[in-house]
């Protein structure tokens, strides 16, 4: 647990996932394997970082290659040192750019960057005679969060970490009654304003056990006693999909 939904953590915390890609995490009593480099949630997981007024927005004006500042369509509370992502506005996925903020001005709408842009990110804004507005612009997202979960695996491995929220049944020995009791666990996770770095596992896994960064499996309908959600998080440098409800 790091913070509560109504009382988020304000300090900086890194959760570092270590271990070999060949070492599986095993459930007790021959309950099976959760796989390698995994946070297995069979109880409750709460991770809540500092919320932001805006986590992603769009460019207000074109950002040309060579520029060291960009103008946003919304005011943000981001600060110098934060990392951001600018999406491509052409057909080249490698024209997505990762930048670091050097300064924030004009009430939070102008970001000065630590290095010039490598590519142009366009904005198209048209108002038609009937009053309809067409606006297409590159997106700008905040990557930085004060809580980070990341893997020490190398990019060549393509096997990062994952968070598996699921259920589990086993028999637990009752020493008083001298018998085994059937016990059922069901996990839940409330996660907000967390940065996941190096998530997901690019491996050949069973259909119902794919290796997304966050895998929510067999949790049933939403329940007030197990209110699972993912809110305002960033997913950075992954090897599989960010999350899935299965």
Task: Write out the residue ranges for each language-model feature.
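Beta-strand/loop edge motif enriched in small/polar residues
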Residues: 1-246
